Amino acid sequence: MAKELKGIAASDGIAIAKAYLLVEPDLSYEKTEVTDVESEVKRFESALEVSRTELSTIREKAAKDLGEDKAQIFDAHLLVLNDPELTGPIEESIKNAKTNAETALQETTDMFIGMFESMDNEYMRERAADIKDVRKRVLSHLLGVTIPNPALIDEEVVVVAADLTPSDTAQLNRKFVKGFVTDIGGRTSHSAIMARSLEIPAVVGTKEVTASVAKNDIVIIDGLEGNVIIHPTEEQIAHYEKIKSDFALQQAEWEKLKNEKTVSKDGVHVELAANIGTPNDLEGVISNGGEAVGLYRTEFLYMGRDNFPTEEEQFEAYKAVVSGMDGKSVVVRTLDIGGDKTLPYLELPEEMNPFLGFRAIRLCFANEELFRTQLRALLRASVYGNLKIMFPMIATVNEFRQARDILLDEKAKLKAAGTEVSDSIELGIMIEIPAAAVLADQFAKEVDFFSIGTNDLIQYTMAADRMNERVSYLYQPYNPSILRLVKMVIDASHKEGKWTGMCGEMAGDQTAVPLLLGLGLDEFSMSASSILKSRSLIKRLDQSEMVKLAEEALNKSTAEEVVELVEKYTAE
């Protein structure tokens, strides 16, 4: 008998295949006393070394298949494995308590996990998740237990799991894994974001799929509407095969728009750009008809290594992207380290809330030579195309002036040395701190453009960590307060003859696109896989009608009212 579950549509598409259950292995053990503590310590160190080798291999595969930005999660896992503040106490526990390595590992990591999970900020809670993932891997090697390896799947399946860890997702082979469904998670969870990168259908947050599915059960995953059907009838299979076929035809239609400009029904042009992390991501931008790079996250050039990239290394990477876009705009964000992004070779202070602390431009000002090195590389690359530079985490006008003055100083030095530098580089800022949005009219007199980073802007405005399930209901992209801030920024830029882009998740959200078009957004920067779908939508919209929609939305009281309004407008 067919059973239907409802979850959250995380990645578009339809998948119909038998289930592959990614279940947790039995890692139970007995606490024992050891007599040869040195041998036990060596057994623990051996398990650490095997785990390091495995994670390094997984990281390389993730970088190749998903891009460097997605692979950097494994740098955090490798940091855990190499952290003497964690491994040291485990070895001391073995020696002092004469306990087996499994017990020492479990008890020591439990202490760290409990400490991190009790903290209020997202960064620290993510460290707890990293420790859990690493502990499972090390424990499996101590016990000689095989962890299910999704990379070994060699037939067409849909993966069913309580949740997917970064390690799991990075090993999914798109040739065989046609989709996945999980018990937990939301649209902005790690597994959902990875599914969109892999371009495979996914439904998350079903709550009970693992309790409802057995190995080899036929499962339908509807990543368009968030439906999951177990033991579907022939009629249901036929119905979803038709939807799958129609969606494939729809994608083929979108593909025809690849070389077209993004113009609304009434002739208003906006730019659809892509977010990238490395030069390797350019292929996806070009194949999906990206009109620009709206966000080049340069921090990924600094990750997965043991030291800072040299000026020459950075120059080559920036040159590759700028020249590769063949004259199209490339907006480069300067180094955004701190918060949830760390470097193993850069010591950062311990902070109660690193997301509100020493990060991004603040860190660059305190490490000025590091900042200057990056700016020199960018300035040298500017002659190879249409480079724009923006500074992250700007809160005050003085911060922008300080960053600009450092850049102009480096530009003058390069020119004095005979190095060619473009004189038409636009300078902008990320709008992710509410203070910058409120003061946009003053910023607009000095910057060339704004790029709204909605992920942080929403969190800071609503005082709600989107990864904290207890307050995630407050992470509301459609809250009128957020829309008013966006409108304020766009209007301020236009008043001064400047432009505004958006590079957060909201820019590629199909519910948000009509609103943003009506609010006057000039550039939408999103994952490359969302570009053609968004272009198709905008071509069907009348911008003058969307202006009316946006005006109505700004006067609503709740996010729910705004969503209802958009659905009503787009259905007509």
UniProtKB/Swiss-Prot annotation:
Positions of the catalytic residues: H190 (tele-phosphohistidine intermediate), C503 (proton donor)
GO molecular function: kinase activity; metal ion binding; phosphoenolpyruvate-protein phosphotransferase activity
Keyword line: Cytoplasm, Kinase, Magnesium, Metal-binding, Phosphotransferase system, Sugar transport, Transferase, Transport
Localization of this protein: Cytoplasm
InterPro entries: PEP-util_enz_mobile_dom, PEP-utilizing_PTS_enzyme, PEP_util_AS, PEP_util_C, PEP_util_CS, Phosphohistidine_dom_sf, PTS_EI, PTS_EI-like
Location, primary (coarse class): cytoplasm
Amino acids binding Mg(2+): E432, D456
Reactions listed under catalytic activity: L-histidyl-[protein] + phosphoenolpyruvate = N(pros)-phospho-L-histidyl-[protein] + pyruvate
Keyword Nucleus assigned: no
Top EC category: transferase
UniProt entry tagged with the keyword Ion transport: no
Pfam families attached to this UniProt entry: PEP-utilisers_N (PF05524), PEP-utilizers (PF00391), PEP-utilizers_C (PF02896)
Residues involved in phosphoenolpyruvate binding: R297, R333, N455, D456, R466
Essential cofactor(s): Mg(2+)
Function: General (non sugar-specific) component of the phosphoenolpyruvate-dependent sugar phosphotransferase system (sugar PTS). This major carbohydrate active-transport system catalyzes the phosphorylation of incoming sugar substrates concomitantly with their translocation across the cell membrane. Enzyme I transfers the phosphoryl group from phosphoenolpyruvate (PEP) to the phosphoryl carrier protein (HPr).
Family label: Belongs to the PEP-utilizing enzyme family.
More about this protein: The reaction takes place in three steps, mediated by a phosphocarrier histidine residue located on the surface of the central domain. The two first partial reactions are catalyzed at an active site located on the N-terminal domain, and the third partial reaction is catalyzed at an active site located on the C-terminal domain. For catalytic turnover, the central domain swivels from the concave surface of the N-terminal domain to that of the C-terminal domain.
Descriptive protein name: Phosphoenolpyruvate-protein phosphotransferase
